[in-house]
Amino acid sequence: MKGQKTNLGESHGGWLNREIKLFGLFLTLISLSNLIFSNNTLALYTPTLSASVDQTNLQVDGNQVIDSADQTTEIPLNLIVNTNNRTGYTATLNSKTDETALVNTESATGAKIDSIDANKTLAGFSDNTWGVKVGSNTNFSPIPKPTAPMNVMQTAGKTNGNESNQLSIGMKLSDNLESGRYTNKLVFSILTNDYNQIAMMTEGPDFNTKLKSLEPPTSEINYFRKSPVPPATSMNAVNIEDEESDYEIKLWLDPTDKTAYYYTETEKVYLNSDSSKMFYSDLYEQKIRNVLEMDLSNFDTSKVTNMSSMFLGMVNLTTLNLSNFNTSQVTNMGGMFGFMSNLTSLNLISFDTSQVTNMAAMFFNIVLLTTLDLSNFNTSQVTNMSNMFNNMASLTTLDLSSFDTSNVTDMRYMLSSMRNLTTLDLSNFNTSQVTNMNGMFSLPDMWASNDKLEKIYVNNDFNTSKLTTFSNIFSNRKKLRGGNGSYLTDPSTADKSWLRVDRPGVHGYFTKKS
C-alpha cells in the first residue's frame, strides 16, 4: 500500500496596525490517499481522494471586532472532501508548528493573540484569544498542536460527491492589542482510512445461473474447486464477482476433469451477503445435480446474512464440510440443506446461529444422514422451525435439549416423517409463542408401518396458550407412549391436551426427563 500526498498551497495573511487592525490566517491542506498499485489486470478498484477548503487565507478587520458590542467574531470555513474509498476518510486539523498563537512578528515585546486554554463558548473567551470549533458544536476548542491534532471528521464509507465539513474560527480582541501583523498557519490533513481490497462473490442466485450455464447437455459438473492459475482463453470463463468487488473472479468448466473452477488473485473469496441458492438444483432439472465433491475452504462467509436454499437439491453430494464457515451474521438458513438425499456426512461444528431467525426446512429430506450434532446451535432468535427435520429418515435419536425455542412461532411438521426415530429429547423446549404445530411428530400413511418412535422427553408440559393450529400432531405414532403409559388407539385424534407430561390423573404423550 502506497501513499499519495497532495499539497494544495498556501496563501498570505493580512496586517494588524493601529489604523486598520487585521489578522491573517494561512490554511494549508494536505491530503493523503492510501492507493494500491497492482500489475495484475484483475484488480478492478483504486481508491481516490480530493480535498479543498473554501478559504485558504482568512482575514479579519480588527477595528470592526474591537468596535463591536462584545468584541468577538466568528469566521466560518468549509473543508470539502470527495473520495470513493469504501472505508471513508479521517480529517484532522493542527497548527503548522508548536506555536498556537497568532504572532506579531514585528513586535518588540512578542505580542500575540493566544489560543484559548480550554473548551469554551465564544462569550467565555479572554481578551486577545482565539479558538476553533467543528460543525454545530457550542464550544470552541484550543488550537491543536501537531503532536495532538483535532479530529474534524471520520467517516466509514465513500462520499456522495463533494462532502462539506463546516468549521469556525472564533476570536475576541481588545483595544489594548499592539499594532502589527498577526499570523499563523493551520494544516488540514485528510487521510483515507485503511482498506483491504477483497474479492467479493456475486449474489447467490446470479452465481447459480452462471454455474448452471457452464454445464452443456454433453457434459456434467462433478467437482467444484479453486484453481491456482487463471483460466486459459479457450475455457470461455464467466465473471462471478459482485459489482463492489475489487478483483475479478472467473468461473469455468474444464470438461476433461468435469470440474468447475474459479480463480481470483486473492487467496480467499468473500461470499455475498445474499448467498441464497448458490448451489441450488431444482428438483425438476438436471443442472449441477451431479456434483460429487466441493472444496469451499477458500470461502469467507463472514459477510453473509442469507444462506437459504444454499445447497438445496444437491442430491449426489455425500460429504459436506463447512467447518470453515463463519455464520455469525446469517439470519436465514431456511432450506439450506434440503433434499440432499445422499448426504451421509455434514460438519457444522463452526456454525454460529445466534442471529438466525429462519430454520424452516433446513434439513428437510436428508434421508441418509444417521447422526446430527446440533449441540452448538444457538436458536434464541429463531421464529420458524417448520419442517426443519422433516423426513430425516435415518436418524434414530435426536437431541434438541440445547434448543432455545422461546421465540419460535411455527413448528408445523418440524419432526414429521422421521420413521426410524426411537427417542426424542426436547427437554428445554419453550413453546409459549408457538401458534402452529400441525403434524409436528406425524408419520404419513405410506410409512405408518415403519413407526419406531417410543419416547419424547421433556421437562414440562408444552405451553399451548398461543397454539391455534394443531391437527394430526401425533398421526400414525402408534408406538409412542407417555411416561405413565398413556396412548390413543388412533393418535391422529390427539388434541393439544396430549402435549403434556404423562402422569397420574393427566394424560399426555410426553415423558418427564429424569
Regions found by a protein language model. Name each.
Residues Y195-S514:
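Negatively charged
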Residues I20-G24, L77-G88, K158-N162, E248-K258, ...:
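Short, surface-exposed loop and linker segments with low hydrophobicity and enrichment for Pro/Ser/Thr
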Residues M1-L44:
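Sec-dependent, cleavable N-terminal signal peptides
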Residues N34, D70, N82, K158-N160, ...:
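Sterically constrained small-residue positions within well-ordered secondary structures
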Residues G3, L102-N104, Y262:
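Short conserved micro-motifs at the rims of enzyme active sites and ligand-binding pockets
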Residues L42-N196:
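Signature of Gram-negative chaperone-usher
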